[in-house]
Amino acid sequence: MAWRTLARYVQSLEDSGELIRVADPVDVELEAGCFADRLVKRGGGAILFEQPRLPDGSISDLPLAMNLFGTRDRTNHALGVKRPDEIGNRMVSLMKPDIGGIMKAPWTGIGLALEGMSMAPMKVRKGACQQIVIKDPDVTKLPIPKTWPEDGGRYITLPLVVTADPETGVHNMGMYRSQVFGPKELGLHWQAHKHGADHADASKDRMPVAICLGGPPEVMFSSISPLPDNLSEYEFAGLLGKRRLRITKCITNELMVPAGLLYTSDAADD
């Protein structure tokens, strides 16, 4: 199922009684993480903190959602399946179609053709993530949690990090835990064997990076999937959502990012 935006998925959780709203202020340092930890361990619902309190005592303008995919049922709901192996079966049918069956009954191949067409991303001029442009961004004002006492600081735990090969321009989207170092500085935890690290190593100068927040479920799951090199995360997101993923160009660099994001930070890797 193509959710298109995270807001649609969160609304579906609320409609089905799977979302807990917390209207009172909750600290992003440790307190919010404690709520989420207890919910995960007891198979509880997703939780939305409407007034996340930042370390300086102020209330963030943005809410904080946690435990969105914390149960098997919610994960299946996010992916639009009853069983996760449905996705694998669809992949197999695309890679090894029943040619004989299609020749005998050509109409049975229509669904397969539509499935394949859904994988090609669609470029659009503007996305939701560009409706408001902040000229002087400060990531410390975002409701980024510190979830464990011994953590080195506050971390974005579900960031969609987009990079490109400096020679071929081929994009990669990975989910790399990002530590807040300052108002305009994040530390990206990409291991040596990840494509993001490959792109950084191959770059002789500052490398453009897009750090994206609040993507729809099909994009989040695609970003963490171990895909072959000839299948992009954007194509796989289209397969998961059964609909072409809309992508748009960043404002300050040439990277293409999902258009339905809540927040995108155009950055550079040093």
Enumerate the predicted regions with their spans:
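A short, hydrophobic C-terminal helix/tail in secreted or cell-surface proteins
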Residues: 266-270
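Extended, highly charged
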Residues: 1-265
